[in-house]
């Protein structure tokens, strides 16, 4: 089973940034250090990141992008519809991945159970290093004036120093 990762999304001052580490592990072995787990969807208007099985995440990215097109780039509606499909489709129910998606206005976490969660604090984090990145981001948001981009970078750096499944090869996308 592929293990761990860290995806973090932060909103601040009208900007949204999403970041991931680059490590892919298989049991106790690092298989890749430079994986790109965040990307732009919906003609560049939606940011997305995944934790979990890579093949499953690509399947979900494709399904999510199809929902975005179907619902005229209404990200919230696309999330709800993908969540419904995830709960009812036998194939999708077997997928092991979590997604964070964000546009200029909203952020959602899509869980493997088909849940669609809009997180508090303007911060969303998933993966094995998610709790560490989330805590670091909350502290940085409360006690600094750092930009969203700088918060995700510094928070992932901290998570990578704590979580063995998170490395310091950070990819960031921003709107």
Swiss-Prot record:
Na(+) binds at residues 160, 163, 166. It is found in: Cytoplasm. GO terms for biological process: proteolysis involved in protein catabolic process. GO terms for cellular component: HslUV protease complex; proteasome core complex. CDD domains: protease_HslV. Its EC number is 3.4.25.2. Keywords: Allosteric enzyme, Cytoplasm, Hydrolase, Metal-binding, Protease, Sodium, Stress response, Threonine protease. InterPro entries: ATP-dep_Prtase_HsIV_su, Ntn_hydrolases_N, Proteasome_sua/b, Proteasome_suB-type. Protease subunit of a proteasome-like degradation complex believed to be a general protein degrading machinery. A double ring-shaped homohexamer of HslV is capped on each side by a ring-shaped HslU homohexamer. The assembly of the HslU/HslV complex is dependent on binding of ATP. This is ATP-dependent protease subunit HslV. The gene is hslV.
């Amino acid at each position: 089973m592929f293990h761990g990762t860290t995806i973090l999304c932060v909103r601040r001052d009208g900007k949204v940034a999403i970041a991931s580490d680059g490590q892919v592990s298989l049991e106790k072995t690092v298989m890749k250090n430079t994986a790109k787990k965040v990307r732009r969807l919906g003609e560049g208007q939606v940011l997305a990141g995944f934790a979990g099985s890579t093949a499953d995440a690509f399947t979900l990215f494709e399904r999510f992008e199809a929902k975005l097109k179907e619902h005229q780039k209404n990200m919230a509606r696309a999330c709800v519809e993908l969540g419904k499909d995830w709960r009812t489709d036998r194939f999708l129910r077997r997928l092991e991945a979590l997604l964070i998606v964000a546009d200029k206005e909203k952020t959602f976490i899509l869980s493997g159970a088909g849940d669609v969660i809009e997180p508090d604090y303007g911060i969303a984090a998933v993966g094995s290093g998610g709790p560490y990145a989330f805590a670091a981001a909350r502290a940085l948001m409360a006690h600094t004036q750092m930009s969203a981009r700088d918060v995700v970078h510094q928070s992932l750096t901290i998570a990578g120093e704590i979580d063995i499944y998170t490395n310091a090869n950070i990819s960031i996308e921003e709107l």
